[in-house]
Amino acid sequence: TSDLNYLLSRRLEVEGRLRKGIENEEFFLRYQPQVDVATGRIVGMEALMRWNDPVKGEIFPKDFISVAEELGLIVQLGEWAFRTACRQLKGWEDEGVRDVSVAVNISPRQFMSRRLVASLLAIVREAGADPHRVEVEITDAGPNSLLGQPKTAALTANWPVPTF
């Protein structure tokens, strides 16, 4: 029971810090280059969410995404990440970088949303980014996800955001 108490207190701590982190805008994106192995040229960037917790420092998604999913905060975080990545893409476009795409991970819960396409299109338009250079990757993050696979499994489905 002491192990269970420890896990429960740790979980409650993460939940509280996660809510506060969203409120205090402690999340940020890192961009990992996607390289064409034939040419060595950077062809895209993958947006990777991180949490800059004031107590724990940089926290990786494996330590907070499942909690965000269970709390129903994942859609909010996913939309924030998509918006931030689209704004960054527009910034790169404004600087003359026009041949690079950006890929953003969304959760199965966000993918199942009825308003997903409308939401993503609105974000792309709001940012003024080229929708043909935005990719969405659907990640399988936990036991209640789209595929019902273990936490280590991942599904990536890339599709350019439509422009209709």
Q: What residue ranges belong to the model's regions?
A:
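Bacterial c-di-GMP phosphodiesterase EAL domain
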Residues: 2-129, 141
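The catalytic core of metal-dependent phosphodiesterases that act on cyclic dinucleotides
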Residues: 101, 118-164
